[in-house]
Amino acid sequence: MLLLISPINHEEALESIKGGADIVDVKNPKEGSLGANFPWVIRDIREITPEDKLVSATLGDVPYKPGTVSLAAMGAHVSGADYIKVGLYGTKDYDEAVEVMENVAKTIKDVDNDTIVVASGYADAHRVGAVDPMEIPKVAKDAGCDLAMLDTAVKDGHTLFDYLSIEDLEKFVNEAHSYGLKTALAGSVKKEQLKPLNDIGCDVVGIRGAACVGGDRNTGKIHHTAVAELKELCDSF
């Protein structure tokens, strides 16, 4: 299981890299769960990240505006992102989610077939009126994406496991794998939750809070020792 760590700036990216993160995921928590950072921040982090590590960029908790989101995707690609993550926040159902994601996939695959397009739903979608999280694997498949992901939309201390059982998550992973897709799971994931995620076959685990000093994704800063501890755990399973 690969470890994805979400820094917000140059300093945190260096800490993530030093700690051994497999994927450096550039985001901006001030703008939401999958808040988008600026192109120059993505570009800077791509430049300092070793070539054998992937850089991911979030496009934001996006609205149901396929054109707007597609242009944002091109911006992330031009800035150097290897993974492009779309938070399906304003899409209320399967049809809207597919429409957004198929346009993002077309935008990216037309220029670089190797860039990984990620459809991300929310385990707590009912709290924000977003598409059902269990529909995300089918959305990703039908839209031509590479990876199906879940996170949590509301960061109030609740974790992925507060909304979906391990059986639900295993079903999510198995369905995505049956379509030939990879999976990523995130949402205030704690250290003790890594093994259950690994055991159900999750490909990537996404973390910010548990990698921060004090464990707070907003007020804390990512530190390499916390990242290294998480990486060691992931590698031990």
Swiss-Prot record:
The reaction(s) this protein catalyses: 2 D-glyceraldehyde 3-phosphate = 4-(hydroxymethyl)-2-furancarboxaldehyde phosphate + phosphate + 2 H2O
Record's function text: Catalyzes the formation of 4-(hydroxymethyl)-2-furancarboxaldehyde phosphate (4-HFC-P) from two molecules of glyceraldehyde-3-P (GA-3-P).
Pfam family, one: 4HFCP_synth
Broad EC category: lyase
Source organism per UniProt: Methanobrevibacter smithii (strain ATCC 35061 / DSM 861 / OCM 144 / PS)
Taxonomic path: Archaea, Methanobacteriati, Methanobacteriota, Methanomada group, Methanobacteria
Record's keyword annotation contains Manganese: no
BP GO terms, sorted: methanofuran biosynthetic process
Protein's name in the database: (5-formylfuran-3-yl)methyl phosphate synthase
Active-site residues annotated for this sequence: K27, K85
GO MF term (any one): carbon-carbon lyase activity
Similarity remark: Belongs to the MfnB family.
Known EC number: 4.2.3.153
Entry keyword set: Lyase, Schiff base
Residues making up the signal peptide according to the UniProt record: none
Pathway(s) annotated for this protein in UniProt: Cofactor biosynthesis; methanofuran biosynthesis
SUPFAM superfamilies xrefs: Aldolase, Ribulose-phoshate binding barrel
InterPro entries listed in its UniProt record: 4HFCP_synth, 4HFCP_synth_arc, RibuloseP-bd_barrel
